[in-house]
């Protein structure tokens, strides 16, 4: 943090996209400044203009469809808007570098890590093969990659998501830039890897005296790294301030909504507040009017406490497992009630094949002796990092992957032994909502076909007209409109697509739904809406869920019971509130510690440490 002159100043910038329906004002008259060695956090939902702002700084937008309508971008005394192409190319990478959200698609799959980092070093003017290799090794060590010699010879698909992002950071640092633009660099990562990347960026910023423009949709992440914050909404900056001021005293209703919609580990929140609880938006021709809702704090607290208590497994079952019973705020399943789903000693092993003849040389125990019960109306949360076995467990229950051994009983029947019509009937009653709403909907099918197709397969509805009526009713239940039936997936936002996926799962009237990372691809504000919807549907329809996620905060909010998975095993099991209050396993404690801490005391402490080391 510094009081020196800004290294980057954006003054009244306007970036528009040309469309058949007129210009889209993606960035609409914004002004920002970034000081030397400072981190500016830019936060907002998808479509707010934050990423377009970053791309505009480096003039990376396609000239055929986008143009800078007005404004200045002054970097070290030069206006980047009017620089010739050759001059702006000297700025890109060398003076201002950028890392993107998805490291898997940012790296070229046909080149090794060494080749890709080396190429960036050569662009900076170093051409000696020996020196390029030495600097590549040094950069990989600097960004915290273990065994950098091995990683240098690896291809992107051979390294983890966290390692890929570290490689991207190494590439960005290769020419010693003054500014690093980090566009959602942790969104695609597990919470523990996210914490490591944030630590790394802080360390690099301080050691290199580098400025960072950090873009995110999550104010919790912003609180961990930023000195100042700019909140963007519909192309405009609606609020700016120090990170402590923004969290302590937010002025704009949109900022208040973003702060309120994140699931918190502390407390017993049964319903998440959303941006719409704080403001409404009216469109008057081309202008947008934001009206703040003056909702008393007591009313907001009442909204958060609305909903049923936790539904815990029978007391006797928990006592046998040695689990501490909570004092209040919970209802127990009756002792004589049988589970709707029973999983016993589930094993899923995948063969490791090598050589020309693809001989099996070993196996990966993706799921290794997993057992649990789920009772009707309950939500069991499966939480853990990527590779822990949680998604494979869900897919094994659905019989989407081969099971090595174990039992899966649904309503007392051996689900693994079902065949023919019995299996078809059971599959109608167990549905799944996948992680990515973009890839789980067929782009060639209308919403109506996506919903009525499964109904026809499972014999739901008398005829096509009846199925269409049912689809329309289900869409409305999920917060969409009947007229959406005739549209295609590309015409919807990410949150709307996930609502369509939920409606598709519910269209065949299931009793049990497996939600596999079903909100991890969404902005936190949209995530809150979808989580509330899932809870409402559970209450209205009496649904039972298995809720899979890497985010302990989300799982705690959604779940009655929680199973923490690591290395294919359940390492901790119990009531979700109790696991947060009193975790018994080191891995669980690690997951909890990795969640961004946006309490005022923690933000204040981080800022004081920054002041001391400035």
Regions found by a protein language model. Name each.
Residues 68-79, 406-414:
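Conserved ABC transporter NBD signature motif
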Residues 4-6, 146-149, 243-340, 353-358, ...:
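Short catalytic/signature loops enriched in Gly
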Residues 80-97, 123, 245-250, 356-361, ...:
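ABC ATPase NBD coupling module
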Residues 93, 157, 175, 490, ...:
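Conserved signature/switch motifs of ABC ATPase nucleotide-binding domains
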């Amino acid at each position: 943090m510094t009081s020196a002159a800004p290294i980057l100043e954006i003054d009244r910038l306007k970036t528009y996209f040309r469309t058949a329906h007129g210009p889209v004002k993606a960035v609409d008259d914004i002004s920002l400044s970034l000081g030397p060695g400072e981190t500016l956090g830019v936060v907002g939902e998808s479509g707010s203009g934050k990423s377009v702002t970053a791309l505009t700084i480096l003039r990376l937008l396609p000239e055929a469809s986008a143009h800078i309508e007005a404004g200045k971008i002054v970097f070290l005394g030069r206006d980047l808007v009017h620089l010739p192409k050759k001059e702006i190319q000297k700025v890109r990478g060398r003076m201002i570098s950028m890392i993107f959200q998805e490291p898997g698609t940012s790296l070229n799959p046909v080149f090794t890590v060494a080749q890709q980092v080396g190429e960036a070093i050569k662009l900076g003017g170093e051409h000696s093969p020996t020196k390029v290799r030495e600097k590549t090794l040094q950069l990989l060590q600097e960004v915290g990659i273990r065994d950098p010699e091995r990683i240098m010879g690896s291809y992107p698909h051979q390294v983890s998501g966290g390692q890929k992002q570290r490689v991207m950071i190494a590439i960005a640092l290769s020419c010693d830039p003054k500014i690093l633009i980090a566009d959602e660099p942790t969104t695609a990562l597990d919470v523990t890897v996210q914490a490591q990347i944030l630590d790394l960026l802080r360390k690099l910023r301080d050691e290199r005296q580098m400025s960072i423009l950090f873009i995110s949709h999550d104010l919790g992440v912003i609180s961990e790294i930023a000195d100042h914050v700019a909140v963007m909404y519909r192309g405009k900056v609606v609020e700016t301030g120090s990170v402590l001021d923004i969290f302590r005293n937010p002025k704009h209703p949109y900022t208040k909504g973003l702060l309120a919609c994140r699931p918190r580990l502390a407390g017993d929140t049964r319903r998440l507040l959303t941006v719409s609880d704080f403001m409404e938006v009216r469109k008057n021709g081309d202008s947008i009017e934001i009206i703040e809702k003056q909702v008393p704090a007591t009313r907001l607290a009442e909204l958060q406490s609305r909903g049923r208590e936790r539904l815990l497994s029978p007391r006797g079952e928990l006592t046998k497992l040695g689990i501490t019973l909570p004092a209040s705020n919970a209802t127990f399943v009756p002792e004589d009630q049988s589970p709707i789903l029973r999983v016993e000693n589930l094993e899923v092993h995948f063969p490791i094949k090598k050589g020309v003849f693809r001989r099996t040389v070993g196996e990966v125990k993706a799921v290794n002796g997993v057992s649990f019960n789920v009772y009707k109306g309950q939500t069991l949360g499966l939480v853990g990092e990527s590779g822990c076995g949680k998604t494979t467990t869900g897919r094994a229950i659905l019989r989407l992957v081969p099971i090595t051994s174990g039992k899966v009983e649904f309503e007392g029947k051996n689900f693994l032994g079902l065949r023919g019509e019995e299996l078809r009937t059971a599959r109608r009653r167990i549905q799944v909502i996948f992680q990515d709403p973009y890839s789980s909907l067929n782009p060639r099918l209308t919403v109506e076909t996506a919903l009525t197709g499964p109904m026809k397969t499972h014999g739901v509805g008398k005829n096509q007209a009846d199925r269409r009526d049912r689809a329309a009713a289900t869409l409305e239940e999920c917060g969409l409109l009947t007229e959406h039936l005739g549209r295609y997936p590309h015409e919807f936002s990410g949150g709307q697509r996930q609502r369509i996926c939920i409606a598709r799962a519910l269209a065949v009237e299931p009793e049990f739904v497996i939600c596999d990372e079903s909100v991890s691809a969404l902005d936190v504000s949209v995530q809150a809406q979808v989580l509330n919807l899932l809870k409402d549907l559970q209450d209205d329809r009496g649904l039972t869920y298995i809720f899979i996620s890497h985010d302990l905060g989300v799982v705690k909010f959604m779940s009655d019971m929680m199973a923490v998975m690591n290395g294919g095993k359940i390492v901790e099991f119990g009531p979700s509130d109790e696991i947060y209050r009193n975790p018994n396993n080191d891995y669980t404690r690690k997951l909890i510690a990795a969640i961004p801490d946006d309490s005022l005391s923690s933000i204040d402490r981080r800022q004081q440490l920054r002041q001391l080391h400035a």
